[in-house]
Amino acid sequence: KDGTVKSYDVVRKEYLKSLNRNIDKKEFGFFVNERQRPFIPDSIKTRSYQNEAREKWQENSFKGIYDMATGTGKTITAITSLIDLLEYKSYYIAIIICVPYQHLVTQWGEDLKKFNIQYIAGYSDNKRNWKHDLEKQIFDLNHDIRDYICLITTNASYRTTFIQNRINGI
């Protein structure tokens, strides 16, 4: 009442404002703040069946599998669904996208960039120090410094002890 006791949300917001985000930008090449939240670009137009699938997914507590034919926009449906989830629950979300081949990691990454979703490309041949990045982002997520993390990985890398142990630490 006298201003000395602050709610968790107020303290968290003040703390996040005080961070030198340029450090993260220098280390990771990006940082996340409110102005850089993921969004659906105006250039993306979803079809009625995609919107219906997203609504059904939301009604099912954001759980389910999209079973759609080739070329019907599964990736866009999935990414716009992620945006819906991030808007509904704006913190502590771990997004893991598993694909069968490394070139699909790259394709998903290119699509996620259009929606301003920051991600880690995690697979064995990636030259970037993605394992360190993943550990850092999980630490930040667990300590309320980061609202979400997104890992795109291959099925083979997903099955590794390294990734499984990190997922269990979230």
Model-predicted regions and their roles:
Residues 1-31:
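Signature of lipid phosphatidyltransferase scaffolds
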Residues 31-170:
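SF2 helicase/translocase NTPase motor core
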